C-alpha cells in the first residue's frame, strides 16, 4: 500500500467503529479519482448538535484529501420518520416542518464543511418522482424476514409492539439514495448498520460498485448513558450561546470528557494521551475540561467567545467555590415532573421537604450557581444540573423521566 494511501486511511478511519471493507477503501483511494462520500441527515429538529459533528468532522477529513462530500438532507425520509432505536412508531413530520428544518441544516453545516467541496442534496429530488408502481418494485427487493433481522424491528415484533408498513421502507429509501448518488463511501453511526449495508446490496443489484461503509461511534449525551439526541434533550447544539455550551461541557463527567476528546477534538492522539497522563499525575480534570470547552466553542463561535465564556464560567461557578468532588445523584421525576422540595430530599441534600421549602425561602438553594426561589417548581429532565443547599451541600443531579 502506498504511503499516501496508508496515511489517508489512518486519518479517515481514526475513531471509526467499523469499516466495510477497508481493502475496498484502499483500492478506491489508490485510483486517484475523487470519491463521492455520502452522509445522510433527517431534519427531525432544526439544530445540529455535537453528536452530528462526529460524522461531519469525518466528512471534512475526506474533503481535506480532495474528495467530494454529499451532505444529503433526507427531506423525503424525514416525512417517514427513522425508526432506528425506537420501540414505537415515530410520528412523521409535515412537509412544512421538514422544509424549515432542512434550511437551518444548510446554514449550520458550513461551520465545519468547506462549501466549495460540499454538495447539498435532498432525497426528495428522486424519491418524490417515484410513483406507486416504482415504490412497490423497490419494496419487492426485500422480504419481511430480512427486515426483521434488524434489531429494533425484531424486538418490537417479539414484544408484540406495532411496526407500521412504511417503517420497512426507510432502510430501502436510504439504500436507494446511494444508488442515485453513485456513492463510493457512506458514513453513518453504528445504529445505522442495517441501513448502510442495504445501500451496498442495492448498488450491487444495479451494477454499481458497492459503497464502502464507515461506521462512527455514537456520541453519548450529557447524561453519559443514552446517545446525544434532540428528542432526549441531552444534547449541546452547535448554535447555542457560547456561555451555555461552555457550561454544558463543563458539566459532563470526567470519564465522559475523554470520550468527547476522542470523538470531538482535533487534537492528536498523542496530545490527548499527554493530557491523560497529566491528570493521572494530579492535574485537575476541570482544567483539562476547560481546554475541550474552549476548543469546541472556538470552532462554532470564535476564540474570543471561548475566552469570554471561560471568564463567565469562572465568575459564576468557581467564585462560588464549587468543590471538586461533587457527588452525582440520579432522581426519577416522571413525565410530569417532581416538586423541587422532593428532588432535594431524594438527592439527600435535605432531611425533609419542609427543610427544603425553608431553605428555598431563605434563598439558600442554588441550581447551576443561580439562586432558586420558586418552591412550587416542578423539575423535569431539562433541569438536571449542580444543586446547592446552603454553603456546603452539593450534588450533581441527573433527572430522568
Curated annotation (Swiss-Prot):
Classification lineage: Bacteria, Pseudomonadati, Pseudomonadota, Gammaproteobacteria, Alteromonadales
Naturally occurring in which organism (per UniProt): Idiomarina loihiensis (strain ATCC BAA-735 / DSM 15497 / L2-TR)
Catalyzed reaction equations: tRNA(Tyr) + L-tyrosine + ATP = L-tyrosyl-tRNA(Tyr) + AMP + diphosphate + H(+)
Top EC category: ligase
Name the UniProt record assigns to this protein: Tyrosine--tRNA ligase
GO cellular component: cytosol
Oligomeric and partner information: Homodimer.
PANTHER family: TYROSINE--TRNA LIGASE (PTHR11766:SF1), TYROSYL-TRNA SYNTHETASE (PTHR11766)
Sites where the protein binds ATP: 230
'HIGH' region (motif): residue ranges: 43-52
EC number: 6.1.1.1
Annotated function: Catalyzes the attachment of tyrosine to tRNA(Tyr) in a two-step reaction: tyrosine is first activated by ATP to form Tyr-AMP and then transferred to the acceptor end of tRNA(Tyr).
Gene3D superfamilies: HUPs, RNA-binding S4 domain, Tyrosyl-Transfer RNA Synthetase
Subcellular location(s) of the protein: Cytoplasm
Gene Ontology MF annotations: ATP binding; RNA binding; tyrosine-tRNA ligase activity
Record keywords: Aminoacyl-tRNA synthetase, ATP-binding, Cytoplasm, Ligase, Nucleotide-binding, Protein biosynthesis, RNA-binding
InterPro entries: aa-tRNA-synth_I_CS (IPR001412), aa-tRNA-synth_Ic (IPR002305), Rossmann-like_a/b/a_fold (IPR014729), S4_RNA-bd (IPR002942), S4_RNA-bd_sf (IPR036986), Tyr-tRNA-ligase (IPR002307), Tyr-tRNA-ligase_bac-type (IPR024088), Tyr-tRNA-ligase_bac_2 (IPR024108)
Motif ('KMSKS' region) on chain: 227-231
Predominant location category: cytoplasm
Family that this chain belongs to: Belongs to the class-I aminoacyl-tRNA synthetase family. TyrS type 2 subfamily.
Originating gene: tyrS
Any one GO BP annotation for this protein: tyrosyl-tRNA aminoacylation
Domain S4 RNA-binding: start-end pairs: 338-399
Disulphide connectivity of cysteines: none
Amino acid at each position: 500500500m502506498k504511503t499516501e494511501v496508508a496515511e489517508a486511511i489512518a486519518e479517515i478511519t481514526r475513531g471509526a467503529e467499523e469499516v466495510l471493507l477497508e481493502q475496498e477503501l484502499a483500492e478506491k483511494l489508490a485510483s486517484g479519482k475523487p470519491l463521492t462520500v455520502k452522509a445522510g441527515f433527517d431534519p427531525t429538529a432544526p439544530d445540529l448538535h455535537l453528536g452530528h459533528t462526529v460524522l461531519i468532522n469525518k466528512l471534512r477529513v475526506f474533503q481535506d484529501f480532495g474528495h467530494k462530500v454529499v451532505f444529503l438532507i433526507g427531506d423525503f425520509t424525514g416525512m417517514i420518520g427513522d425508526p432506528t432505536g425506537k420501540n414505537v412508531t415515530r410520528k412523521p413530520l409535515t412537509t412544512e416542518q421538514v422544509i424549515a428544518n432542512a434550511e437551518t441544516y444548510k446554514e449550520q453545516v458550513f461551520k465545519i464543511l468547506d462549501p466549495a467541496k460540499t454538495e447539498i442534496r435532498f432525497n426528495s429530488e428522486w424519491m418524490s418522482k417515484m410513483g406507486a408502481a416504482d415504490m412497490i418494485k423497490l419494496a419487492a427487493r426485500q422480504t419481511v424476514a430480512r427486515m426483521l433481522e434488524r434489531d429494533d424491528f425484531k424486538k418490537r415484533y417479539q414484544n408484540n409492539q406495532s411496526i407500521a408498513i412504511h417503517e420497512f421502507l426507510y432502510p430501502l429509501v436510504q439504500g436507494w439514495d446511494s444508488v442515485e448518488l453513485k456513492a463510493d463511501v457512506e458514513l453513518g453511526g453504528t445504529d445505522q448498520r442495517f441501513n448502510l449495508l442495504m445501500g451496498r446490496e442495492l448498488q450491487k443489484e444495479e451494477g454499481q460498485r458497492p459503497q464502502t461503509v464507515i461506521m462512527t461511534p455514537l456520541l453519548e449525551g450529557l447524561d453519559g448513558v443514552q446517545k446525544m439526541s434532540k428528542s432526549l434533550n441531552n444534547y449541546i447544539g452547535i448554535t447555542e450561546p457560547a456561555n451555555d455550551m461552555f457550561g454544558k461541557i463543563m458539566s459532563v463527567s470526567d470519564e465522559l470528557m475523554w470520550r468527547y476528546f476522542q470523538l470531538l477534538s482535533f487534537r492528536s492522539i498523542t496530545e490527548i494521551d499527554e493530557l491523560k497522563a497529566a491528570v493521572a499525575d494530579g492535574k485537575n480534570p476541570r482544567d483539562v475540561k476547560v481546554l475541550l470547552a474552549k476548543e469546541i466553542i472556538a470552532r462554532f463561535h470564535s476564540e474570543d467567545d471561548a475566552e469570554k465564556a471561560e471568564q463567565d464560567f469562572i465568575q459564576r461557578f468557581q467564585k462560588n467555590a464549587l468543590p471538586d468532588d461533587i457527588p452525582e445523584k440520579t432522581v426519577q421525576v416522571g413525565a410530569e415532573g417532581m416538586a423541587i422540595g422532593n428532588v432535594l430530599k431524594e438527592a439527600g441534600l435535605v432531611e425533609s421537604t419542609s427543610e427544603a421549602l425553608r431553605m428555598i425561602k431563605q434563598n439558600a438553594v442554588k441550581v447551576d450557581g443561580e439562586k432558586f426561589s420558586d418552591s412550587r417548581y416542578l423539575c423535569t429532565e431539562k433541569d438536571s444540573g449542580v444543586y446547592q443547599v446552603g454553603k456546603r451541600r452539593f450534588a450533581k443531579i441527573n433527572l430522568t423521566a
